[in-house]
Amino acid sequence: MRTSHMLEHLMEALRCLPGVGPKSAQRMAFHLLQRDRKGGLQLAEALSQAMVEIGHCQECRTFTEQDVCHICSNPKRKENGQLCVVESPADIAALEATGQFSGRYFVLMGHLSPLDGIGPSDIGLDTLDYRLQRGDISEVILATNPTVEGEATAQYIAELCREHQVTASRIAHGVPVGGELELVDGTTLSHSLLGRHKLF
């Protein structure tokens, strides 16, 4: 089926979203044009506004409309001296939803990946190094993903912490709550055994 240039352009633009291929993009475009033009206009306006007005927090690098985000500007979040290092702003949302962490964050916006040309300065480790030098951080909690790149990134940051005599800890990895051992992969099970803790 031959489509108009504008429609092709819309479908191509929609494909920038993760998990959206040609068919999904076509379905979305047709839905907006056929059934929800008002929603399409609202989406276009919201996207345009967000791309212009949402930037990065000067302290933790998460997304915010201000120079400093609401977490970093909260004096109570500084009291325990804890800094949780994550790979993306989505990780902050997940951790905040638990209600278990009351410190501050630092967002890497990725992980070390030499094969892809992503080095320490590309993920803000020079900025993190400067923050460690300031002396107001007593513990860095490494919450990078349990991938090869995430582990390598955590090890690199742990070395930075050692240089500044700041405690570094790694979030636990293991068997999910409600999970069955026979269904858990070997690597996860190994992490569970190595990260076990005493009950008495």
UniProtKB/Swiss-Prot annotation:
A zinc finger (C4-type) spans 57-72. Belongs to the RecR family. The gene is recR. The keyword Amino-acid biosynthesis does not apply. GO terms for biological process: double-strand break repair; recombinational repair. The keyword ATP-binding does not apply. Residues 81-176 form the Toprim domain. One of its GO terms (molecular function) is zinc ion binding. It comes from the Bacteria. This is Recombination protein RecR. Keywords: DNA damage, DNA recombination, DNA repair, Metal-binding, Zinc, Zinc-finger. The lineage of its organism: Bacteria, Pseudomonadati, Pseudomonadota, Gammaproteobacteria, Vibrionales. SUPFAM superfamilies: Recombination protein RecR (SSF111304). May play a role in DNA repair. It seems to be involved in an RecBC-independent recombinational process of DNA repair. It may act with RecF and RecO. InterPro entries: DNA_Rcmb_RecR (IPR000093), Rcmb_RecR (IPR023627), Rcmb_RecR_Znf (IPR015967), TOPRIM_dom (IPR006171), TOPRIM_RecR (IPR034137). It comes from Vibrio cholerae serotype O1 (strain ATCC 39315 / El Tor Inaba N16961). It holds the Pfam family Toprim_4. Transmembrane segments: none annotated.
